[in-house]
Regions:
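Substrate-binding cleft and catalytic face of glycoside hydrolase catalytic domains
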Residues: 1-135, 139-141
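Glycoside hydrolase catalytic-domain groove-lining segments
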Residues: 13-24, 103-137, 144-208
Length: 208
């Protein structure tokens, strides 16, 4: 929503500031959520066509990958973020421009029911960010319907020959609330971590 908010507009200042800071201080970084619900007002405008949305996000992700690839301090990228809701449905478009929504599902799904934007995002990242670990990042809690869909989608991508190096979870374990991960939920989290490792995936807690 900042770098490429609409066609013909590019604002790299913030990205370059982060890159310069990490390089000057030898700080390892991850690129978080380039494709997901955090989208520009232009992208969330209800009149957008699939073609317009495809062109915008493909241009953005391609140029972002080219800019960060080869930087020794950029180790990971959360290629897609918050793609599935807690009920196991694809995070979708909502009316208007002031809501938390994912406009990219309007691009469509393939014959297997997988959103095209997810597949294309990993294709672009695999081609243009070969030096970076590619992560499928997810939010919410320990809802089995959601995690089953996450697992199915990751395995689908891998079976299609796409590189998925890790699974990320936004833990949001804030110290100002009672942690909701009781023993049952902790055990479920452990099972997700085990599943990731069994399928040659790193497991990251990406937001503490």
């Amino acid at each position: 929503s900042i770098v490429h908010p609409e066609p013909g507009v590019w604002k790299w200042d913030r990205v370059e500031a982060f890159l310069n800071f990490s390089n000057a201080n030898n700080i390892k970084m991850r690129v978080h959520g380039p494709i997901g619900p955090q989208s520009s007002t232009w992208a969330k405008t209800d009149s957008r066509t699939a073609e317009e949305l495809s062109e915008l996000y493909e241009d953005f992700l391609t140029e972002l990958c080219k800019k960060i690839n080869g930087n020794s301090n950029i180790l990971w990228m959360d290629v897609v973020n918050e793609t599935i809701d807690s009920n196991g449905n694809w995070t979708d478009k909502r009316n208007g421009t002031n809501q938390w929504e994912n406009p990219w599902t309007q691009i469509g799904k393939n014959d297997d029911g997988i959103p095209l934007y997810i597949i294309k995002a990993f294709e672009i990242a695999q081609q243009h960010a070969p030096d970076i670990s590619l992560i499928f990042n997810q939010h919410a809690g320990m809802q089995p319907a959601m995690w089953n869909k996450v697992k199915e989608t990751i395995l689908y991508l891998k079976n299609k020959g796409l590189r998925v190096d890790g699974l990320g979870w936004q833990g949001h374990l804030r110290d100002n609330v009672v942690l909701s991960l009781n023993q049952s939920k902790l055990n479920y989290l452990f099972s997700i971590i085990d599943w990731a490792h069994e399928n040659d995936l790193d497991f990251h807690i990406t937001e503490i």
